Design a protein with these regions (language model features):
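Membrane-interfacial loop-to-transmembrane alpha-helix junctions, especially the N-terminal start
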Residues: 8, 73-82
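Cytosolic juxtamembrane helix and N-cap/initiation of the first transmembrane helix
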Residues: 1-17
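Membrane-interface helix-boundary motifs at transmembrane edges
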Residues: 1-4, 67-74, 101-104
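Non-cytosolic membrane-interface motifs at loop->transmembrane helix junctions
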Residues: 34-45, 74-75, 101-113
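Membrane-water interface at the C-terminal end of transmembrane alpha helices
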Residues: 116-136
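Core segments of alpha-helical transmembrane spans in multipass integral membrane proteins
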Residues: 17-19, 26, 40-67, 81-89
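Membrane-helix boundary connector in multi-pass membrane proteins
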Residues: 70, 85, 91-109, 127-128
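Membrane-interface helix-loop junction between the first two transmembrane segments
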Residues: 24-36
Length: 138
């Protein structure tokens, strides 16, 4: 069970770091210069800030309640499942609508690879906990 806990905490920690890093992305990459209408800059920044706050908060909550996941607390499993669903959604969206690699190849493939990594790190422990929970009920 220890390796699943390590995967869980590493995946949640990377998710938290992505959320915190995302606060700075619009300014690091000069998003405003790519947006043709000045009136859209502030709303896009608001959406990014809200997403960053929610991803960071959800990831931190999942980290802080990690022990409850492995004793199979149902409420915590729902939060964990939601975080996992978010990363699965991210991977699926990237497959359907890939980031154009001509803008920055390493960034495009790095984002996709990182998303798959976090998804796997969170998915494997989730399957393990869910399967032991079902076996426990029988």
């Amino acid at each position: 069970m220890k390796k699943y806990q390590i995967m869980y905490y590493v995946g949640a920690a990377i998710s938290l770091l992505v959320g915190l890093w995302h606060f700075t992305v619009p300014w690091m990459f000069g998003w405003a210069s790519y947006i043709p209408y000045e009136t859209l800059v502030v709303p896009i920044n608001y959406v990014n800030l809200c997403f960053s706050f929610l991803l960071s908060g959800l990831s931190l909550t999942v980290i802080l309640w990690g022990k409850k996941v492995f004793v199979q607390n149902p409420e915590v499993l729902y939060l964990y499942g939601f975080l996992l669903a978010l990363w699965i959604f991210r991977v699926v969206v990237e497959v359907i609508y890939p980031c154009p690699p001509e803008s920055n190849v390493w960034m495009s493939y790095g984002q996709f690879g990182g998303s798959v990594l976090v998804c796997v790190l969170l998915l494997v422990p989730f399957i393990r906990v869910a399967s032991t929970r079902k076996n426990r009920k029988k």
